[in-house]
């Protein structure tokens, strides 16, 4: 078992091991004790792993029940969030209680935000079941729900008590969902390591899962420890997200998060080339790797359709939008621009 420790405002461990789901109750009990708990999951994940985690927690002495909701970004809203709160209240979960998030990024966001706000905060544990959530969204304590105006506009920072990553569960993922998570993996390489980028180019991701998980989680851990509340260095993790979130929202979330981030990274890198921040070969190598991982690289919407969404993004501060701009593979820089210049960057990124 690989353990990665996160020294945040609430320190916790991320445990990586094949088959750890069967011992979930035992591992959670070590950290949280065995008390009352609610497992929050999505309807596609629960039939696969719900009973395993539920029985494991019952065997460890937990008084545990479950709540499931329809999968997909469309469920990441205030209505479903309220349903989770009502489920907690109906089960009389106290401040000593626990929420377990079993699922992908949407589940982690929803369960985490409920944990942050129910009774002004209770503990929660992340059991991510997608590549995207294992390498990214389950690490760092960001929780949120969407509004019609955009993604993640209502949320809180809430560090988990424990994260359990089981690489075995990724074997059940259909290729589109698996490769969707690879966008965040490639993002990590673009941010921090040319060598890791080359590893991704040479070897199939399914053949190096543990290596991918350990690199991406450790990279994000380092950034979170430096800037837990996203005021400086952590903004780097938004590479591809400023424009990507706009693409995702413009599609009414029919374009998945990873695919949107892939498009967003290409847009930002193309703009960086045109504005002299990096060389053309950086863009060429990025596009080639994304295509190898079956990820989209073309901008599906005009700049006019994306503009207002970018300006209302949660990363916009007043009249300033901070862009994460590649300089080379393994290094990016923060570039603050005025909101009036967003259209120019969108156009430079390939949005007509």
Task: Give the residues covered by each predicted segment.
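A glycine/threonine-rich phosphate-anchoring loop and its flanking beta-alpha core
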Residues: 15, 113-202
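Solvent-exposed alpha-helices and their adjacent loops that cap or buttress functional pockets
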Residues: 31, 92-94, 117-118, 146-147, ...
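Generic secondary-structure signature for well-ordered alpha-helical cores
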Residues: 93, 159-163, 168-169, 175, ...
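Short glycine/serine/threonine-rich phosphate/pyrophosphate-binding segments
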Residues: 106-113, 134-135, 246
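C-terminal charged capping/lid subdomain of soluble metabolic enzymes
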Residues: 183-185, 277-352
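Active-site segments that bind and position negatively charged phosphate/pyrophosphate groups
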Residues: 198-304
């Amino acid at each position: 078992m690989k353990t990665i420790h996160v020294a945040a405002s609430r320190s916790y461990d991320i445990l990586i091991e094949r088959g750890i789901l069967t011992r979930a109750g035992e591992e959670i009990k070590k950290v949280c004790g065995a008390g009352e708990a609610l497992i929050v999951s999505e309807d596609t994940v629960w039939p696969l792993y719900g009973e395993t985690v539920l029985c494991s927690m019952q065997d460890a002495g937990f008084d545990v029940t479950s709540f499931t909701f329809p999968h997909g970004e469309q469920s990441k809203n205030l209505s479903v969030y309220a349903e989770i709160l009502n489920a907690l209240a109906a089960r009389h979960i106290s401040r000593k209680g626990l929420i377990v998030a079993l699922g992908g990024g949407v589940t982690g966001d929803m369960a985490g935000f409920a944990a942050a706000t129910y009774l002004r905060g209770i503990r929660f544990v992340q059991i991510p079941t997608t590549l995207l959530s294992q390498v990214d969204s389950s690490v760092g304590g960001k929780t949120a729900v969407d509004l019609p105006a955009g993604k993640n506009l209502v949320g809180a920072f809430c560090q988990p008590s424990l994260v359990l990553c089981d690489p075995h569960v990724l074997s059940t993922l259909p290729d589109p969902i698996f490769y969707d998570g690879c966008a965040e993996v490639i993002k990590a390489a673009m941010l921090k390591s040319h060598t890791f980028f080359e590893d991704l180019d040479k070897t199939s991701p399914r053949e190096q899962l543990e290596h991918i998980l350990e690199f991406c989680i450790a990279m994000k851990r380092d950034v979170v420890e430096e800037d837990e509340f996203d005021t400086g260095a952590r903004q780097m993790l938004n590479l591809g997200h400023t424009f990507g979130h706009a693409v995702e929202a413009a599609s009414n979330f029919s374009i998945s998060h990873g695919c949107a981030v892939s498009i967003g990274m290409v847009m930002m890198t193309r703009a960086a080339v045109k504005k002299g921040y990096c060389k053309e070969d950086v863009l060429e190598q990025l596009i080639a790797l994304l295509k190898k991982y079956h990820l989209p690289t073309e901008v599906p919407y005009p700049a006019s359709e994306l503009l207002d969404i970018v300006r209302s993004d949660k990363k916009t501060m007043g009249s300033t939008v901070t862009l994460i701009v590649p300089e080379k593979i393994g290094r990016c820089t923060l570039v603050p621009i005025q909101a009036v210049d967003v259209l120019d960057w969108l156009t430079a990124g390939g949005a007509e």
